[in-house]
Curated annotation (Swiss-Prot):
Cellular component, GO, one term: nucleus
Gene name per UniProt: calD
InterPro entries the record matches: CAT-like_dom_sf
Primary location group: nucleus
Function of the molecule: Transcription co-regulator that might be involved in the regulation of the expression of the gene cluster that mediates the biosynthesis of calbistrins and related compounds such as decumbenones. Calbistrin A is a secondary metabolite with an interesting structure that was recently found to have bioactivity against leukemia cells. It consists of two polyketides linked by an ester bond: a bicyclic decalin containing polyketide and a linear 12 carbon dioic acid structure.
Conditions for induction: Expression is induced in complex medium (Czapek yeast autolysate medium) supporting calbistrin production.
Applied value in biotechnology: Calbistrin A has been reported to possess a number of interesting bioactivities including antifungal active against Candida albicans and cytotoxic toward both healthy and leukemic human cells.
Protein name stated in the entry: Transcriptional regulator calD
Keywords for the protein's UniProt record, in alphabetical order: Nucleus, Transcription, Transcription regulation
Higher taxonomy: Eukaryota, Fungi, Dikarya, Ascomycota, Pezizomycotina
Transmembrane segments: none
Locations listed in the record: Nucleus
Entry-linked Gene3D superfamilies: Chloramphenicol acetyltransferase-like domain
Organism: Penicillium decumbens
Length: 494
């Protein structure tokens, strides 16, 4: 945990002299990201052509620049990760690892797929993503960085499971490749190629250079939470708290569905309260502000209601939001880890002695204040200073005993809004029985594994489906999930 223990370098396959070698971007080659492999799964309630899915995916990845995604991961003599890009991709050295399983049965009749999460009429815990590993990746797919380093395999694994009325499409990859924003770009561009709209695929940005290499070398203002940076014995006390907590409590993952009407009512109420409190008739909070405040209140519900314990909320923030006019042009695809963090500091009592609107508005203000170009650059400067001083880019802001919740909202990635209808062989579920159009995902699911770090309290928000429901999931203490499940089940319908 926390990278305190290191193992010797794995033995790599023989090098290919014709490979193009490119170092990973600094933001990609970190201790945390090295330890994580992720899988994204999409359920389509239609029968999709697996051959079309495979060929269009390969066609996208073999475009100029995009070929980098098919690279093999290797360690150089300095212990840093490199991309080894084959001169050409073929059956011996494919651009993507491909697997396909077909079941001659409805998705609703299969013993495992019949348990896939379904939307609920009220906020509810609807499943455990780990229960579906058999459906989301093949047994041969790499599960750790060690697997990638010791085998001559591409970074992406495409696994398709076909039923008589549905199709599950899953992509697994090392987190060193990209974040949720980059993953969404791959997904959307794949759909463009599938639709024969290749000319609309944006050019690949940063093929053999890092556009963020010098970002944060200077900053025009201090970072807003500089005084909260943990150093010295306070940092080590924080680590001890985390190690103890990880040892004492078992971690488990769950999937939560939040119906659209429920969240809309919560947001409407919050905006009314905020405007009445501030006298500002233009004050607002977003769906994300309300959703993260609402779930954080659930997650800290085991503490005494009047506790002054610090609760730190982190929202991932895409750097392209502030760098879209220069370093990360919006007209190009940047497949890398290019997110920063925006923090909000509250206390447990803020969630239980004040209305939910208080926490939601605090999150909104943090997003507005911390999401400027100047503040994003100031935080990046702190990260670079931490790297120079301590050998990693992991500054910790807050206090040693704080409770942390982290969120990454992928709604803007439009996972539920991407059109795969060009691959339909046969429509599955009747149109009147579903909210989404044929060829659009009815479910998006995520899972991640880390060989070194506890991913507890990291909650991706997968987005909003066609019916308006929000989906989020992630690992918490098992006892916390059991309490949340009970509270949601017993909450009166409004």
């Amino acid at each position: 945990m926390f990278g305190l223990f290191r193992s010797k370098a794995p033995e790599a396959p023989p090098k290919h002299p014709t490979d193009t070698i490119i170092p990973l971007n600094a933001a990609d080659d970190t201790e945390v990201l090295r330890s994580v492999v992720v899988v994204l799964s999409y359920r389509f309630d239609d029968v999709l052509d697996p051959v079309k899915l495979k060929s269009s995916f390969e066609k996208l990845l073999d475009r100029p620049g995009w070929r980098k995604i098919g690279a093999r991961l290797r360690l150089n003599d300095n212990g840093r990760l490199e991309y080894h890009i084959p001169e050409r991709y073929d059956e011996k050295r494919p651009i993507v690892t491909w697997s396909h399983v077909s079941h001659n049965v409805s998705v609703l009749k299969h013993p495992l797929s019949s348990k896939l999460p379904r939307a609920s009429a009220r906020p509810a815990v609807v499943g455990d993503p780990n229960d579906f590993d058999e459906l989301t990746s093949s047994p041969e797919a790499p599960k750790t960085l060690h697997d990638y380093l010791t085998r001559d395999v591409p970074q992406l694994c495409l696994h398709v499971v076909s039923f008589t009325d549905s199709t599950l499409v899953s992509i697994s990859l090392p987190h060193t490749l990209t974040d949720g924003t980059g993953g969404a770009q791959i997904y959307r561009c794949w759909a463009l190629v599938l639709q024969d709209r290749d000319d609309e695929v944006p050019p690949f940005h940063g093929y053999d250079s890092d556009p963020l290499a010098t970002f944060g070398e200077t900053s025009s203002q201090p970072y807003m939470y500089d005084p909260k940076l943990l150093t010295g014995w306070r940092k080590w006390l924080f680590i001890l708290y985390q190690v103890y907590d990880g040892w004492r409590y078992r971690t488990s993952s769950r999937i939560v569905c939040v119906p659209g009407p429920y969240l809309a009512a919560q947001r409407k109420k919050a905006i009314e309260e905020i405007r009445a409190e501030t006298g500002n008739d233009k004050a607002f909070v977003s769906d994300n502000d309300v959703l993260t405040a609402w779930f954080t209140r659930l997650a800290v519900g085991h503490y005494p209601r009047n506790s002054n314990l610090t609760v730190r909320i982190m929202n991932a923030f895409a750097l392209a939001s502030v760098l879209g006019n220069d370093r990360l042009p919006s007209t190009k695809a940047f497949i890398s880890n290019a997110a920063t963090e925006i923090y909000t500091f509250l206390s447990v009592r803020d969630f239980f002695t004040k209305p939910l609107s208080y926490a939601a508005y605090a999150i909104r203000r943090s997003m507005m204040e911390g999401g400027t170009r100047e503040q994003v650059e100031a935080l990046q400067a702190v990260k670079k200073q931490t790297l120079a001083r301590e050998g990693h880019t992991w500054p910790i802001f807050g206090d040693a005993s704080m409770e942390m919740m982290s969120y990454s909202n992928w709604t803007k990635g439009k996972y539920f809004e991407t059109d795969f209808s060009a691959a339909i062989v046969k429509e599955g579920f009747a149109r009147e029985a579903r909210a989404e159009k044929p060829g659009f995902a009815s479910m998006v699911q995520f899972n991640a594994w880390s060989t070194k770090f506890d991913l507890r309290n990291l909650m991706p928000i997968m987005g909003k489906d066609a019916a308006g429901n929000y989906w989020l999931q992630g690992p918490l203490r098992d006892v916390v999930w059991k309490r949340i499940e009970k509270e949601l089940r017993e909450e009166p319908l409004q």
